[in-house]
Structures are given as C-alpha cells and as structure tokens.
C-alpha cells in the first residue's frame, strides 16, 4: 500500500513544543511518513530529536546553518513519498488529529 500522507515538520528552536507535537503526530493512525527538518536550532531541539525520535520518525534533516522555513521545506521535498503532503508547524497551531478530515476532503475533489 502506498503511503497516504507525508508530514513535513520544519523546526527552529522548538524545544518547548516539538516533543508534544511529535507524540501527537506519531499517535495519529493515518498511514504517514514523517520528515523533520531542523533549521540549525541552538536550544536543545537538535539533541532531543536525535536522542528521542531518530528511530521513530522516517527522516531527520539537520541544516548546518539557519536557512529559513522555505529552505527547510525544500530540503524535505526530495524524500516525499506520500500521496498528500502537509507542512506541520511545530508550534501546534494545527492539530494532527485533523489529518483524516483534510485527507477526506482532498479525496472528494
């Protein structure tokens, strides 16, 4: 079966929210690929990703300098395998529990 969804998560100094976000994304039952792009964080985000999530997400990309959100998304593009792609900000502005309804709407059109 093909992967339904690729979730790209660009992060920069998100030590206060990234763990909670990744747990929510991982707990979502939709068939997904998770790509995290760390845009040269300096607050411990990088270490947290390595120590807690390197074997739980599909891909972690580390930028050697801060390049911005657009560059983070672009870095992930070549690894996308999902039928659909979502850019999930690390600040939890968008709830991962909405993935099913977003996919359902996309499938209708």
Question: What kind of feature is each model-predicted range?
Answer:
Residues 1-109:
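Structured catalytic core of nucleotide-sugar glycosyltransferases
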